[in-house]
Amino acid sequence: MLQTTPPDLLPGAADVREAVASWLTLLARERRFSPNTVEAYARDLRQFLAHRARAGTQPDIPSLVALKPRDLRAFMAARRAEGIGGRSLMRALASLRSFARHLEREGHGTVSALSAVRSPKVERRLPRPLPVAAAVALASPDIRAGEDRPDWVLARDAAVLALLYGAGLRIGEALGLRRKDAPVGGLDTLTIVGKGQKTRMVPVIAPVQAALAEYLAACPYALAPDGPLFVGQKGGPLSPRVVQLAVASLRGALGLPDSATPHALRHSFATHLLARQGDLRAIQDLLGHASLATTQIYTKVDSARLMSAFEAAHPRAGRM
């Protein structure tokens, strides 16, 4: 059970709390969902149980199995009234369906109401990649010269962002690397364990290796082989929030829009490769997407604009 959602704090009867605990354990250990995904699923179910309790129904397993479509629609309407968007509602339904399947597997019966409720339609947002020059600038240690922070911290931030743009990593994947994983000293690949514990091999180009080597040379801490590769100013694991704040500061200095985030560098990696006639399935493998359809959304980005940008700066060239 997640530490943030102890069983005794969940709304509902004891049988529901026990079922939720076993369900979340299944998601984490057998389905190998990431901690963030398990947390989101737990939160969705907790909100639904709280909604049922506010409506005057003490949630227990028999009452959940006997749910009517109108009960689910009432929950969705209440969440919409609270300002929750379509994507979050779609995930909430996915969470409820996952829990319902768990109840069915455990022999409690079928929650047939869920099959009668459609997921909200959500228009898929296009990725918002950065122009090549902006992505190169964000991932460049030179752009940080003069900042009022220790040189090793500037080198660290540059190395993290170089991994996002130069290798297409998610920020959680980059910050989850151990010291012994660092692709330096002749190593030019990374083994990444991504969403759903899916493993992929990622090539690491020379500018990224150089950024990592510069950080390691400057870092004042003795990094244990099995410890985090990236550390904060006190030597503990680096928080994603620190990287986000660093990018926000650079955004202002470079005059970039609010869409210039750490994750935008991963979008830029994929879109810029595709614009250079990169193979879609190869890009899918590099990004760690389970479905090709997820990668195909990058084909809708204006490739003509990107090709023009590539004439000014090529991301696979010697610059980062």
Swiss-Prot record:
Keywords carried by this UniProt record: Cell cycle, Cell division, Chromosome partition, Cytoplasm, DNA integration, DNA recombination, DNA-binding
Catalytic residues (positions): 170, 195, 263, 266, 289, 298
Highest taxon listed in the record's lineage: Bacteria
Molecular-function GO terms, alphabetical: DNA binding; tyrosine-based site-specific recombinase activity
InterPro entries: CB, DNA_brk_join_enz, Integrase-like_cat_sf, Integrase_catalytic, Integrase_recombinase_N, Integrase_SAM-like_N, Tyrosine_recombinase_XerC/XerD, Tyrosine_recombinase_XerCD
Subcellular locations according to the entry: Cytoplasm
Biological process per Gene Ontology, one example term: cell division
Gene3D superfamilies reported for this sequence: 1.10.150.130, Intergrase catalytic core
Keyword flag Metal-binding: no
Domain Core-binding (CB): 14-104
Location (main, coarse): cytoplasm
Pfam families tied to this protein: Phage_int_SAM_1, Phage_integrase
Signal peptide span: none
DNA-binding in keyword set: yes
GO cellular component, one term: cytoplasm
Similarity remark: Belongs to the 'phage' integrase family. XerC subfamily.
PANTHER family hit by this protein: PHAGE INTEGRASE-RELATED, TYROSINE RECOMBINASE XERD
Protein name, entry field: Tyrosine recombinase XerC
